[in-house]
Structures are given as C-alpha cells and as structure tokens.
C-alpha cells in the first residue's frame, strides 16, 4: 500500500473538495488514461486494487503509471469511545481527487486491451470515471 515515508504533521483537517482539478488533469506519460468525474477521497487500498487489476489484465504488456498518491492521513477513534479526549490516531491514507484528475495512465498496448484493463480499474474506484485517449 502507498503511504508517505514521513510527514511534517501526523494529523490533518478533513478540508473540503471545491472546484475542478487544476493539476494532473492532462495525459503526460502514456496514451490512454482513467479520469475522475467526481470529487472523492481514494484510499491507498483502492489505488492498489486498481493497479493490480490493470497489471493482471495487461499481462506483461505495456506500462502503467499511477498518477495519484495518498498523502492525507485519515484518523479514526476506537469503537465505543466516549466523546472528547482528543482526535483519533491515523488509520489509513487517502488521495484527495477532484473532477478532471487523471488516476491511471497506460501505454505500449492496443486500445482494446487498455480499455479493458482501465475499465477493471474503474470498477475498483468509488467514483464515476471516464476512459480518455491522448
């Protein structure tokens, strides 16, 4: 699973996802890509599941680039804990994704192989996505 090696602070505010993605919204490595159409937090497990699905489907052909990185810690309180007594401890990491953001890129394969592999990755994502070609 992806996570930062070290961070400046252990915990972060939740924040809000306004607007569309101004960075990472163009294909820059491969020829085919998966683009987000909705705002969401995508966990490191979901990113890894999508990457594995694409890799298995492509079978030694082509190259895959993961364009998002989970750099936001999500904290959880233990079950049946009373209110108060501070913020919970970091449990998992998420990538903040806005509409227009490229999630995965693929190159070195034919379009139908890329379409099939990327649709498998899309099914692992918690948001609506679209397949795009550069």
UniProtKB/Swiss-Prot annotation:
GO biological process per UniProt: mitochondrial translation
The places in or outside the cell where this protein is found are: Plastid, Chloroplast
* Keywords recorded for this protein, A-Z: Chloroplast, Plastid, Ribonucleoprotein, Ribosomal protein
Q: Name one GO cellular component term.
A: mitochondrial large ribosomal subunit
Spell out the Basic residues composition-biased ranges: 1-17
Where does the UniProt entry say this protein principally localizes? plastid
Q: For the region Disordered, give the residue spans.
A: 1-21
**Molecular function terms in GO for this entry?**
rRNA binding; structural constituent of ribosome
Q: How does it assemble?
A: Part of the 50S ribosomal subunit.
Query: What HAMAP family does this protein's entry cite?
Result: Ribosomal_uL16 (MF_01342)
Q: Tell me which family the UniProt entry assigns to this protein.
A: Belongs to the universal ribosomal protein uL16 family.
State the name under which the record lists this protein.
Large ribosomal subunit protein uL16c
For this protein's source organism, the top of the classification is:
Eukaryota, Viridiplantae, Streptophyta, Embryophyta, Tracheophyta
Instruction: Write the gene name.
Output: rpl16
